[in-house]
UniProtKB/Swiss-Prot annotation:
Homodimer that oligomerizes on DNA into higher-order complexes that form bridges between disparate regions of DNA compacting it. Interacts with Hha and other similar proteins. It comes from the Bacteria. NCBIfam families: PRK10947.1. It is found in: Cytoplasm, Nucleoid. Residues 112-117 bind DNA. A DNA-binding protein implicated in transcriptional repression and chromosome organization and compaction. Binds nucleation sites in AT-rich DNA and bridges them, forming higher-order nucleoprotein complexes and condensing the chromosome. As many horizontally transferred genes are AT-rich, it plays a central role in silencing foreign genes. A subset of genes are repressed by H-NS in association with other proteins. Keywords: Cytoplasm, DNA-binding, Repressor, Transcription, Transcription regulation. InterPro entries: H-NS-like_N, H-NS_C_dom, H-NS_C_dom_sf, Histone_HNS, Histone_HNS_N. Belongs to the histone-like protein H-NS family. This is DNA-binding protein H-NS. It comes from Serratia marcescens. GO terms for cellular component: cytosol; nucleoid; protein-DNA complex.
């Protein structure tokens, strides 16, 4: 809570601040505060109505499923199984290029991601092309 809201929430501080204001100013502030409170009540009641409507619809669909002989838990299990089956890992890409690194070891590269420094250096400085490194 911000400091300003803490001041509004403390009766002693409000009384001290109110002594410095005219009655007209205090009444104007009260009207504005009432408008804000009413707006907030309206928002809360609208949100509650939306929740109740959603709950009513969910209950209606549940009853329709039961009337058709479908157990809602069975439907959820089927949905979860389909979701799990759809998340298969993709196959590893086969190597497309072969090169020797700084240590003289033979390495491969799929062509995905950053170009290895050895290949990049050979292309830029020695005038080679990627085709020279094909497997």
């Amino acid at each position: 809570m911000s400091e300003r809201l803490k001041i509004l929430n403390n009766i002693r501080t409000l009384r001290a601040q109110a002594r410095e204001c005219t009655l007209e100013t205090l009444e104007e502030m009260l009207e504005k505060l009432e408008v804000v409170v009413n707006e907030r009540r309206e928002e809360d009641s609208q949100a509650q109505a939306e929740i109740e409507e959603r709950t009513r619809k969910l209950q209606q669909y549940r009853e329709m499923l039961i009337a058709d002989g479908i157990d809602p838990n069975e439907l959820l299990q089927t949905m979860a199984a389909n979701k799990a089956a759809g998340k298969a890992k993709r196959a590893r890409r086969p190597a497309k290029y072969q090169y020797k690194d700084e240590n003289g070891e033979l390495k491969t590269w799929t062509g995905q991601g950053r170009t290895p420094a050895v290949i990049k250096k050979a292309i830029e400085e020695q005038g080679k092309s990627l085709d020279d490194f094909l497997l």
